[in-house]
Amino acid sequence: MNTSHPIPTTMASKSFLSLLVALFVAICFVLSPGVDAAKGPVITNKVYFDIEHGGKPLGRIVMGLYGKTVPKTAENFRALATGKNSDGEDLGYGYEGSSFHRIIKNFMIQGGDFTKGDGTGGKSIYGSKFPDENFKLKHTGPGVLSMANAGRDTNGSQFFICTVKTAWLDNRHVVFGHVLEGMDVVYAMENVKTSRGDKPVEPITIAASGELPIEHEVDEQGNQVPFRIEL
């Protein structure tokens, strides 16, 4: 209805219209959280790291990957976490046995350099480097999983997990996942003693890594509900 040129109505029709408007507003209010949640990125894969610090078990980190939003980046991480490509063939390299070489408290923990271990190495499953896929997802807070790089289109295998919101990294680093379980382990890693270059004094290693099944929910009609995380 054009409010600048109101349409003549009877009292009864006005009451009916008011009721409809009130009902519409109420429905929108009730459904709005669900709509926002439904727009969250779909988690297509779950992978885990079993972490050791100084040779002693520290705990497990479970991460969800956004394979619908950034399929190429998510598959790179999944393959490196499992050591197998999408066909189940061994890569001959990957994250297992590698270390977290850079820890900065109130910022992030960084790993993924399985060739040199100092932040200068690593490689992707697509070759040495691959381009930035997109910057649709943002660094919204603790637990965000994002690609480390040396500038535009230089993604390899190195990644970081945020321990705080890092909005200044938006549109510069590709977000591709989120920690689902084990943030206590991440915070424990964040607080270890470090030396020059933010390197842990005692090594933090990925003792084991792999993929976990996703348990999908089912709606009232028996349809599988996508596994999402609300950002």
From Swiss-Prot:
Q: Which GO terms describe its cellular component?
A: endoplasmic reticulum lumen; fungal-type vacuole
Q: Which EC numbers characterise this protein's activity in its record?
A: 5.2.1.8
Q: Which UniProt keywords apply?
A: Endoplasmic reticulum, Glycoprotein, Isomerase, Rotamase, Signal
Span of the annotated motif Prevents secretion from ER:
228-231
Pfam families documented for this protein: Pro_isomerase
InterPro entries documented for this protein? Cyclophilin-like_dom_sf, Cyclophilin-type_PPIase_CS, Cyclophilin-type_PPIase_dom
GO BP annotations, alphabetical order: protein folding
- First-level EC class: isomerase
Q: What is its main location?
A: endoplasmic reticulum
Q: Where in the cell is it found?
A: Endoplasmic reticulum lumen
Which reaction(s) does the protein catalyse, per the Swiss-Prot or TrEMBL entry?
[protein]-peptidylproline (omega=180) = [protein]-peptidylproline (omega=0)
Residues with an annotated glycan are: N155
Q: Where is the signal peptide?
A: 1-35
Family of the protein in this entry: Belongs to the cyclophilin-type PPIase family. PPIase B subfamily.
* Main function: PPIases accelerate the folding of proteins. It catalyzes the cis-trans isomerization of proline imidic peptide bonds in oligopeptides.
What protein name does the entry list?
Peptidyl-prolyl cis-trans isomerase B
Source species taxonomy: Eukaryota, Fungi, Dikarya, Basidiomycota, Agaricomycotina
